[in-house]
């Protein structure tokens, strides 16, 4: 489409479960992107894991053709975005490729914490925002009340908000007309020189790397020689196209359009999300600003259960990194687990999803170590360090001070659950910053240590509020803290994979909980097994797995007592040798247990 006034690029932003993927389904259905036989729920949620969990993980794009009431045909490029805070990087990339957004709010629940986070990102990208109130067919729907909430909390005019029921297809025409009449078209191309933003990329086993682009200026054609400005790599374009949501091959993409191209790219490192793509012969003068990279805040180790799978894990992580630029990894080794990778994530759900994708898509069986965050260490000799692996923590005698990251959390909760939510935040060492009411819902702002959040905070928040509380957070500051390295010893040997950095006030509780759980998980041997938790040289918790007793006298039916004594002495000597040289095998379930002791 060469006339930009008939193009609209827009995102759908909303809190989890407010109906953005369902609305996307109805828009595709209404515009004839798929016929009735091909339609399925959550069309744009392409991964099985997305459909099973009912969440969007990857931002998806689709081109819709719509004949408006004014008689003109418009080309609508829709970017469906995730709602969970852990996938905010996906949201930011989608918003950078668009000029406007549909803000979908559940009219039975109102504005939630992650609605705020995503809408503020849209405002930062200078988006025109159209409020859409979903689920108006339900008896609990309160559209007028929610309109007032949007105006009071977000500060945008909601008087002309579109009322819809995405599930039943009510009001879809009104949404499409609002997109045409209220959202701006792309800016006119200022030059014929190709300038395109690399929005996303993924690996296709047949085509190599597939790149999703938003064309800012010029045109992208088949057989063009294009250059990635960030890496200076040059490729010949083989296929150009867009999604309807089926893959549709065309010969050209014009300014203002969103589409994909392939160029037999085999090196994953050449495709950096946010890079600028231009014509090799006639390069653009200035690169696009790209995206602000998201910094991982939660780290853990991935180790293959079979060491022969290491290379497969390495290749799999490279392919996933291409598809999800917000997680990072580097090689590390552990005396207990062998060689693996230290990986960084935007949150615990992000970690869980990556782990599940490695298992499903690449058939990998992994051991995952306990999650940790980045700590700042200041040494007595003036040196400063940043560590996220407890094994790298220097001797406490050489440390002058340590700082841990704190977050600013916004929690929206119905007023009947305020007491339990405040108790949970207090238990997690939280400091209350603000407490206000919007009708029957409370908005609580807390300052919380990230270390306390990465274990089980989200699950416990949902549990204590019966699923009604919503939670959004952002990094705040680093502050001095009394931190210690909690180490686990099995038969006197430190198991580095189970070490974790905790606040001194929580060390005994967490150490005791882990010792009790390991006692149930490690199989009994023919010797006593001591499981200990230590801070420095002090043992703070201990559990003992009692030995299995083998009856060596079972074959003796009487006779000289010296024969029995000889057998018992031999058994005693054998057990002494086992205590000295025996290795205790720790099952994988013990390492998984380390992820689940946060609230005990």
UniProtKB/Swiss-Prot annotation:
InterPro entries: EF-4, EFG_III/V, EFG_V-like, EFTu-like_2, G_TR_CS, LepA_C_sf, LepA_CTD, LepA_IV. Keywords: Cell inner membrane, Cell membrane, GTP-binding, Hydrolase, Membrane, Nucleotide-binding, Protein biosynthesis. One of its GO terms (cellular component) is plasma membrane. It catalyses: GTP + H2O = GDP + phosphate + H(+). The keyword Magnesium does not apply. Belongs to the TRAFAC class translation factor GTPase superfamily. Classic translation factor GTPase family. LepA subfamily. This is Elongation factor 4. It comes from Rickettsia typhi (strain ATCC VR-144 / Wilmington).
